[in-house]
Amino acid sequence: MARVTVQDAVEKIGNRFDLVLVAARRARQIQVGGKDPLVAEENDKYTVIALREIEEGLITSQILDLRDRQEQQEQEAAEIQAVTAIAEGRR
């Protein structure tokens, strides 16, 4: 079982409440969203992996927001392409 000291992660994020939000969001991305961990898994739980990523400075709230926006833009572009292809097929 991995032991994690969250003090370094708290210092990276700013306060423990925001740390909980960021770590939970990242753990959910890894577990459900199919995102690859940025650190070695070492048989750790998703929350521990998220905390280790935060401690190492690989994940912040801003980074998560940026990645979400990029994914949303890519999805919107794909949807526009699909709609355009359908519209051109009807002509």
From Swiss-Prot:
SUPFAM superfamilies (alphabetical): RPB6/omega subunit-like
GO MF entry, a single one: DNA-directed RNA polymerase activity
EC number: 2.7.7.6
Family annotation (Pfam families): RNA_pol_Rpb6 (PF01192)
The UniProt record lists the keyword Transport: no
UniProt keyword annotations, A-Z: DNA-directed RNA polymerase, Nucleotidyltransferase, Transcription, Transferase
Reaction catalyzed: RNA(n) + a ribonucleoside 5'-triphosphate = RNA(n+1) + diphosphate
CC annotations in GO: DNA-directed RNA polymerase complex
Keyword Hydrolase set for record: no
One GO BP annotation of this record: DNA-templated transcription
Gene3D superfamilies: 3.90.940.10
Enzyme class: transferase
TM ranges: none
Family annotation (HAMAP family): RNApol_bact_RpoZ
Function recorded in the entry: Promotes RNA polymerase assembly. Latches the N- and C-terminal regions of the beta' subunit thereby facilitating its interaction with the beta and alpha subunits.
Family: Belongs to the RNA polymerase subunit omega family.
Family annotation (PANTHER family): DNA-DIRECTED RNA POLYMERASE SUBUNIT OMEGA
Subunit structure: The RNAP catalytic core consists of 2 alpha, 1 beta, 1 beta' and 1 omega subunit. When a sigma factor is associated with the core the holoenzyme is formed, which can initiate transcription.
Protein's recorded name: DNA-directed RNA polymerase subunit omega
Lineage, highest ranks first: Bacteria, Pseudomonadati, Pseudomonadota, Gammaproteobacteria, Enterobacterales
